[in-house]
């Protein structure tokens, strides 16, 4: 059996805007089913999800996709955060969403995910005047041209990576 890289990804405890975290585990591959991916742990005191004397947190895999950066049989593993006893951690908002979706299956909800981007140079958004603000959004919203849009090459690479991995994305702005 070959060894592959599984990049475990989770949402941390920062508020009001949580951050993504990840770490790599070497596992047996190739992987074809979620059940082949083991749970793993991390130090929650470093991610605002625990305190020093009680900081072990569990990552339970909930989905996986091909890794568009590493290629081959390597995978990205989406996880939810639990306490060591397998109960959902207070920052695990996914568990609430799963409950809502199950209760309202008959409504056949639709979701369209569009990725929007803000690139920074230092502490300011790229293209903004030093210490100031740009013109109103109108001219550069869904803009075209080097004077309106920055980082389009990164946007295209990200979109290609999502499509390669089978991640549902319906467009970019």
Show the residue positions of the predicted features.
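Glycine-rich, acidic/polar active-site loops that bind/position phosphate-bearing ligands
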Residues: 1-173
């Amino acid at each position: 059996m070959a060894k592959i890289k599984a990049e475990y990804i989770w949402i941390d405890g920062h508020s009001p805007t949580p951050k993504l975290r990840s770490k790599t585990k070497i596992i047996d591959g190739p992987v074809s089913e979620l059940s082949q991916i083991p749970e793993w742990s991390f130090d929650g005191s470093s991610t605002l999800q625990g305190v020093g004397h009680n900081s072990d947190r569990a990552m339970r895999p909930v989905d996986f996709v091909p890794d568009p950066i590493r290629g081959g049989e390597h995978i990205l593993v989406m996880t939810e955060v639990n306490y060591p006893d397998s109960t959902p951690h207070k920052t695990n908002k996914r568990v609430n969403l799963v409950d809502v979706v199950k209760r309202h299956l008959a409504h056949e909800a639709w979701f369209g995910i569009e990725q929007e981007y803000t690139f920074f140079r230092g502490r300011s958004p790229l293209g903004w005047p030093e210490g100031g603000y740009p013109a109103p959004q109108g001219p550069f919203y869904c803009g075209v041209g080097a004077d309106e849009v920055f980082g389009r090459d990164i946007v295209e690479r990200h979109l290609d990576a999502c499509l390669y991995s089978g991640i549902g994305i319906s467009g970019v702005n």
